[in-house]
Amino acid sequence: MSMGNKNKWWKNAVVYQIYPKSFQDSDGDGIGDIPGIINRLDYLKKLGIDAIWLSPVYRSPQDDNGYDISDYQDIEPMFGTMEDMEQLFAEAKKRGIRIMMDLVLNHTSDEHRWFLEAKKSKDNPYHDYYVWRDGEEGIYPNDMNSVFGGPAWEWVPELGQYYFHQFSVKQPDLNWENPKVRRELYDMILWWMEKGAGGFRLDVIDQIAKEPDLKITNNGPKLHEFLRELSRETFQKGDMITVGEAWGATPEIAKKYSNPDGSEFSMVFQFEHIMLDQEEGKEKWDTIPLNLVKLKKCLAKWQNTLYQTGWNSLFMNNHDLPRIVSRWGNDGKYRKESATMLATMLHGMQGTPYIYQGEELGMTNVQFDSIEEYEDIETLNMYKERLEKGYQPEEIMQSIYARSRDNARTPMQWSGDENGGFTTGEPWFAVNPNYTRINAKEALEDENSVFYYYQKLIRLRKENPVFVNGKFELLLPEDERIFAYTRTDEHTKMLVCTNFTDEEVSCPLLDEWKAGEVWIRNYEDDREGNILRPYEAVIIAFTGK
């Protein structure tokens, strides 16, 4: 039985997220697969990561890229077989890498056996596995909309009922009020733990306690009661790393999710910092420039509130987000500098860092000429909706370039060979044309690459407990160009100092710290005086005080 979260292995760990469809194809069908991941484990071992978060590989109609699961205990054939999955667990274990499964417990696919049964009649034993409301066709139970647009209710004429779906119409919500549903889910999780899973990322977990009649979707009244039961019945029976995805989390709520007593999760994914370059009250497509002062205050708040009372996840990229080097950096002239600066800013903080595939290469957003080249359901829906509202196509495309989930889903760039070494066949989605100069082969041959910088950052975290335990203090809070902070424990005080601009900036802090030891910096040669060059980052430490 695991007792609390005090000195857990995952506090020192670095996690690497794989989106299997776009990572590595092994059989030439143009779709990344599990054997492809196995073939690249040595690359990940070299990077230095401890765990892989694997986006869903369960059997699925792929209406929402595998987040619509039709069988939790089978593997989607395009990714491989259960034998492949077992081999992945075994091969990763040999290299000291754990596999975190991506769990979707809020909804299933409408092709899941439970839902097919549930639709047969109101008396079917599976009917109450989902959320139904009586009604008349065309008169919705209420005006709630789904996350992907359109009503959150779908009419089933045979039953004279609507079912509730917070996401796509092919993703009916599970009824967590039903203890049978919860038991089925717990048994499935225990089955995966037995197979060799080392942890779980819980998709939209803050939505499970919804109360549609009250229009409550996230943080419903029974949420934490359900989560404590989930943890008690499953994760606490093994040494799992668990992270809950909670778009609506505040630091106070996150304390509950990541309570050091281990009663819910190891940590939470919060998105407050990720929303700062979006117009307030508007959609994610309505972008504004990042205000660095706001970013600093936001991250400092999370660092300080969760210090000794919870645990942070540190991330800037995932399969839903645009590439950070294009978003908050400079993906042209200063691509390497800004990619490594952003990494330094993040990895110096307290929490468990997550690296999304290709982030360690400084992979960038993509700009396809036509909407026809895009795949993502959310992007295509938005294009259609905004055209109808009278937006100009060029204007909509600019939003897509900045924000589409497809930015993260172009195939991994392994080499300068055709299709970036991702596949010998026709890729399911086009590779970013810049693969000829941004790729893993090139990075591994250049000792000053983004890859080796990440490797160094990871090693620093492993060797210096101040990264795990040090107290955070934000410096220069009102400075619009420099993000600087210290981390301090009983033996070490370290300064993380980064320049968020493409200009030279003078930073008086560097005069005060000039006697310290430089642990890492993202320029090859030393600075002059207290000047930070464009997107420069440095970590300086005093030890043994």
Where are these regions (language model features)?
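Active-site and adjacent substrate-binding regions of carbohydrate-active enzymes
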Residues: 2-545
